[in-house]
Regions:
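Residue-level recognition of alpha-helical structural elements
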Residues: 93, 112, 134, 195, ...
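Glycine-rich phosphate-binding loops that contact phosphosugars or nucleotide phosphates
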Residues: 121-239, 244-248
Length: 275
């Protein structure tokens, strides 16, 4: 997608004022079912929108596509980048639950924390990095691991750059970088810079993060595919919970002592609600 080749939704919006009534009917159907166009052929779009196949073929050409296959490829490419594709949500939640279940199974099928957990538990310092949609996942991981051990920081904080966080790292440290799709353009440079410090780099993201994996020592892949317009991070947060629990399990005695000490401070400051 470029300014010269905008996404399908924008092409439809731009073209609507100039379309014939039949083309408008088809275009409005396409606009409301963008995600489904990844699988529909021209005959299906024609039938579902109540127009002729010739109308659909003509509309595709007006939108800059040669045929339905190009439209399908375009929509699939958009979805693979994580770009939201607006459309009517599926009726009920069965498809959503099925996809969430598939994501969880895929995330845990190849998950091996037997090396990563002790590595994190024994590190001098942990820096957890996340950008954009990955930031909440990074924040949650930092909060969970901070219950189990000290010296766990999150970066970048608002108004903060990464340089000061990375400059102090060395071979005894671990950097956990969360990088789900729609990452900033500097992402691969960040991974390489973290690895250049000598720290062990654990990289977590969807399958597309593999292109950044050469600089990382360890890779955790979590699918974020969804049947709705937006990516789902349910599997990612579940893996975060499992990872934090595994880190705690590596140093149970000290972890329990830290949790108890944190609880005492909570009580002293009256920070948490009571039941």
């Amino acid at each position: 997608v470029t300014p010269q080749h905008p996404p399908l939704g924008q092409r439809l919006a731009d073209a609507l004022p100039e379309l014939s009534p039949q083309e408008t009917r088809a275009a409005e159907f396409m606009r409301d079912h963008l995600a489904d166009l990844a699988v529909y052929n021209a005959s299906e779009v024609a039938r579902l929108s109540g127009v002729s196949k010739a109308t659909i073929s003509r509309l595709y050409r007006r939108l800059g596509f040669d045929d339905a296959e190009q439209v399908r490829d375009h929509v699939r490419a958009l979805r693979s980048t994580g770009a939201p594709i607006a459309g009517e949500p599926p009726a009920g939640f069965s498809a959503h639950l099925a996809r969430e279940s598939d994501n969880l199974r895929a995330a845990f099928a190849d998950l091996d924390l037997s090396v990563i957990a002790p590595l994190i538990a024994g590190a001098r310092r942990i820096v957890v990095i996340g950008f954009r949609n990955s930031y909440p996942v990074a924040l949650h991981l930092r909060q969970q691991m901070a219950q189990a051990r000290d010296a766990v920081t999150l970066a970048p904080l608002p108004g903060q750059s990464l340089g000061e966080e990375l400059a102090a790292l060395g071979p005894d440290d671990v950097v956990v970088i969360i990088g789900f799709r729609r990452r900033p353009s500097s992402f691969e440079r960040v991974v390489a810079a973290a690895a250049a410090t000598g720290a062990s780099v654990v990289l977590m993201g969807d399958d597309s993060v593999r292109r950044s994996a050469p600089s990382a020592a360890y890779l955790i892949v979590c699918p974020v595919d969804a049947v709705t317009a937006f990516d789902s991070y349910g599997a990612a947060f579940s893996v975060v919970s499992a990872l934090a629990a595994a880190v705690l399990g590596e140093s149970l005695a000290s972890g329990r002592a830290r949790i108890a000490a944190i609880g005492d401070v909570y009580d002293g400051l009256d920070e948490l609600e009571r039941f």
